[in-house]
């Protein structure tokens, strides 16, 4: 085994870099959809601290309630998040929060929303904020993923911390039951899964797992996600015919470079910069320096507000 292979890079990834701004191999994620999902992700970041949403409340009604009770300006959030909150109410006005899970043991927060106007069911994971979240982030050992539809040999191994947070206290089962119940009522709806940081990793893992339970199209749009699993995970993920992943990253975001040792990214990568974006499809040949801590070293580029500003600026 070569040195770069040991670090987690394939032979292709250790060769030359091939450029970008080409069409994605699979259908491109709609920019408006990506922006809507990021706005909902930003809303979830503030849910426990500032916001109260009853299940089946529309997003429009929720925002109207904030405005009548002192306005968005009364919230202890910055202007970027206030803007995102207002925009998501305008763009997904009849969206409903169908389920909200907040697990005290793992500090996981995840919501399930339904948009009849856009015919989609969204599962939205909150990103890393608490000490507990970072504890799961830094559990870098792998665990074999055991579920129907996966080969046992060779095993598919994923980040033990992410898997533990998703499956503790039946969170995963509750989410699957909720989504499958909504599919029974809306069989033609697309399933969208999203999150930022830890939420991005959880959305990637959840999207893969639920794609084995449903026939509907599952689209994962992750933001600032770390790597989730090994090479067998990557292969199993990218052959699923009903599963699509658009991995949105800031150019120098350090979190997207970890874990490094024998972990691999999955899906199409949309890389954001201040004045442009680049697209790396599934079969793109990347330089071995790409997405390592030698090139992705900035903690500030991990900020969800910067993702929002760049995604708003870079249209496709």
State where each predicted segment sits.
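Surface-exposed loop and adjacent secondary-structure segments within mature catalytic domains
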Residues: 126, 137-144
